[in-house]
Amino acid sequence: MVEYNVTSTTLEPKTGWPVVDRLLGGYTELETLNGQVVARCLVAIILCRFIAVWSYNLWFHPLARFPGPFLGRCSLLYRFIHSSRGRIHSAVADAHKKYGDIVRIAPNELSFASVESWKAIYGHPTRGNEIAPKGPFYEVFAAGFNSKCVGSERNPEKHALMRKMLNPAFSQRGLLEQEEIISGTIDKFVHVLGEKAGPGTKGLNMTKWYEMNSFDILGEMAFGESFHSLDTGIPHFWADVVLEHLYIITLLDNLRRIGWLAKLAGLLIPASLVTKNQNSNYSRQQVEKRLGIQKSRNDFVSLLVDKVRAGEVSKEEMTAHVSTITIAGGETVATTLSGLTCFLAQNPDKLERLTKEIRAAFKTFEEINAVKSQQIPYLQAVINEGLRLFPPASGGAPRVSPGFTLHDKYIPKGTEVNVSPWSITHNAKYFSDPWEFKPERWLDPNSKDIKDASRPFLLGPRDCLGRNFALMELNLVLAKLLWSYDMELVNKEINFLEQSTVHVLWWKPGLFVRWHKPQSPGFSPS
């Protein structure tokens, strides 16, 4: 039986055999080791783990031969730091300037910045080459829904079926049939600006008002009812939820690259605090309302409603579709309009030319329509230049390499690949004076600019479904606004590009504008 010396400051065993006592005494000393030693051991183990992983990424990984910033080649820190700050687009552009057209920005991720890369990654497959499927990012984008949608479906065959189902609603013909709904909201928008942002006022924050207009249009088109932001003058809460949702997606897209950390985050973050659930739950409520409308409507989702009622499409799939259409369609168009407003106001000669051409094209406000607006050459040049200078999806569209060769370099299968729109459109190799707002470049037959370097709507079998809708709204809003008013930027010194940040889509600074009725006879829509 072992006795213990209870008078000692530590609990020491006493057996009566000196040798055994010494052995047991040494053992119990381990139990009294302080936490610092244990902590140091854990730190050493973790450090060794990092050194091993970083060494593999730097010298033995299949992408080890590709250049890039040190933190990007060895770890995820480069991506984490710059994406959390909303400046990943700018950091990647700087990396391309230093390292060339192909840059390794994460251990298993390559960024591309060449005209050839657009077709190689997003174009139709040629000569038996497989199509590059969408990347794991889209799994994160679909979070909150129990169904994939046209924006998140990664399987090319399933995506093609979804596109075929939705294409008629977004065709030029389909949209012209819906123009009355779109124009009705825009007319209200133009009227409200004249009332609230005329001479003597502080102006209105057009960053928010363009979002309100776009969301009201999409409320009509996707859910059968406006969000009434233009009526109240207050952004609908869903617009703010969308921006928070996009920030959460940025965070989760980083975490998903470290599997165990993503699982831990899922356990630590209560579902009620994750805005993706607010987004999906509100979408479900709105879809239920839309399905309850019995009167026939000519909008985006009429075909979907019929298919849900026929049992061909689930309500959850319809919900995922309309949520994606609202987020992508609302934010991107509003972003482009905000950028164009700032660029035009800061370049009065461009604004004057555009205004004159619009007012010369239409004698009355009622004459303005989508078809005639899109026949004004300088208006198209202005829109193209705005999309180049401020690409609405500057974060890119990630894909997974099926295994292909580009610029004489083999891109291993399974590599995450992405074209950086910002890097290409701000490269002097493709556009002269890339940081200048020069719509004339799109009209000059002698221009040496490589126009195909700007692909705001992507290309190939998974190009932007809403391209025609976006162009229709951009043309109608600009034509009706500039026909009705002269524009005055209040915060003239704003650096719009520098103050905007990317979290999937753009977070933009306030842009305050006054709208003056022109001296010549005009029209104030009712």
From Swiss-Prot:
User: What is seen without this gene?
Assistant: Abolishes the production of botrydial and accumulates 5-hydroxy-7-(oct-2-enoyl)botrylactone, 6-beta-hydroxy-7-deoxybo-trylactone, cinbotolide B, and cinbotolide C.
Residues modified by carbohydrate are: 5, 205, 281
Q: How does it sit in the membrane?
A: Single-pass membrane protein
The cellular location(s) given in this protein's UniProt record come to:
Membrane
Q: What is its EC number?
A: 1.-.-.-
What GO molecular functions are on record for this protein? Answer: heme binding; iron ion binding; monooxygenase activity; oxidoreductase activity, acting on paired donors, with incorporation or reduction of molecular oxygen
Cofactor or coenzyme needed: heme
Annotated heme binding sites: 464
Major localisation? membrane
Q: Does the keyword Transmembrane apply?
A: yes
Gene Ontology CC annotations of this record: membrane
| One GO process term, biological-process aspect | biosynthetic process
Q: Which family does it belong to?
A: Belongs to the cytochrome P450 family.
Q: What does this protein do?
A: Cytochrome P450 monooxygenase; part of the gene cluster that mediates the biosynthesis of botrydial. Botrydial is necessary for colonization of plant tissue by the T4 strain. It is a strain-dependent virulence factor since highly aggressive strains like SAS56 or B05 still retain substantial virulence when botrydial synthesis is impaired, since they produce also botcinic acid. The first step of botrydial biosynthesis is performed by the sesquiterpene synthase BOT2 which catalyzes the cyclization of farnesyl diphosphate (FPP) to presilphiperfolan-8-beta-ol (PSP).
Q: What is this protein called?
A: Cytochrome P450 monooxygenase BOT4
Q: What is the species of this protein?
A: Botryotinia fuckeliana
